[in-house]
Amino acid sequence: MKKILQRMDKPILLISIIMFAFGLIMVLSASSMESYMRYGFSPYHYFIRQAIFLGVGIIPFIFIIVFPTSKYKHLINLAMFGIVGLLIGLTVWGSVAKNAQSWFSIGPFNVQPSELAKIIIIMFLAMYYDKHKDELDNQWVLLKPILLCIVIFVLVAIQPDLGTAAIIALLTIFIFYAVPMTKKTRNIYNKIFLGGILVILSVLLATGGSFLRSYQAERLNFRDPCERYQEESGYQLCNSFIAFKNGGISGQGIGESTQKYLYLPESYTDFIFPIIVEECGLIVGIVILVIYMILLFRIIKIARTATNIHNSLIAYGVFAYIFLHLLINLGGVMGLMPLTGVPLPYLSYGGSYTISLMVAIALVERVAIETNTKKEKVLRKS
């Protein structure tokens, strides 16, 4: 275990420990009032649950960093078809929350298979393209795994959970483009994806989004939220802006947020960043963004130095996974794009996402361990 710790990427490990700890503190602060009013006058309900999620996440984290990725490659296909089965099962046995049938209720906890699907897609595509690395000039070989990802996308979209579905689609596309292929082949797919985007935009413009449910169409309108205060999306975003304004440069102090007093819905999940800025100030908000940038830089570095396609695609996939959550969450709470209910890495409350993120970080660390192990062997031989 000592050698494993020595070969891990220390900045990523340190960032993860600090951010998860800070996130736990902010979940306590942001959720205390709702917890107090809903769960027997105790402010610690969500805090305790989040601590449990982190504790559970340590188990797969340790497993992944200890065992080489080659040890469980053969299980990925089974996991991929298993997650498809779970998503199909949601249509019959799933619990409805926040207008989406996305969860299985297991005792006091809810499990969201679509969060696990993101990680499994990363591992599946990495395993597949590494296995077929000598056949990547064959179009069918390139596209075959994408078809299964499309099935997962559709199953998530019909829940309906368009935010998670969008991340699954973009994550798949990003990993696909990270696959080494000829320039000619890449140009062909550039045209296909551009054409697909134009078709989607044309459908949206032609229909005016009439195929969307009312609350989904409302979320697409993210302009002038305070003038739409009676609408759900306007109410949420306007209170998000108020939280940012209240925080100023230095913040009101941890625990001193006013927006968490049931003014800002989802203050400890999707909208935790405005609460952080309100309590800790713009300076801390900027520091958090810088930490995220350092994290992403380290992951890209690991992806570029990986010793094989499998490990490289895993690292690129985790980069995209974290980046997309950052982009969509922060873009939404800042009014730069529609609200989609996507959690903020490390900081938002949520069991399925927290455990999935810990698995993702463990995968990157395992790639770093294997790269550093190989470097050490080369140095010893020389």
Q: What feature does the model see in each segment?
A:
Residues 1-16, 47:
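N-terminal membrane topogenic signal
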Residues 222-273, 280-284:
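TM-adjacent membrane-interface loops and short helices in multi-pass inner/ER membrane proteins
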Residues 1-2, 27, 329-382:
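A juxtamembrane structural motif centered on a specific transmembrane helix
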Residues 17-32:
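Alpha-helical transmembrane segments of multi-pass membrane proteins
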Residues 32-38:
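Juxtamembrane/transmembrane-helix boundary motifs at the membrane-water interface
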Residues 17, 21, 39-233, 274, ...:
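Hydrophobic alpha-helical transmembrane segments of multi-pass inner membrane proteins, especially
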Residues 4-6, 141-142, 261-264, 306-307:
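Helix-boundary and loop/linker segments of multi-pass membrane transporters
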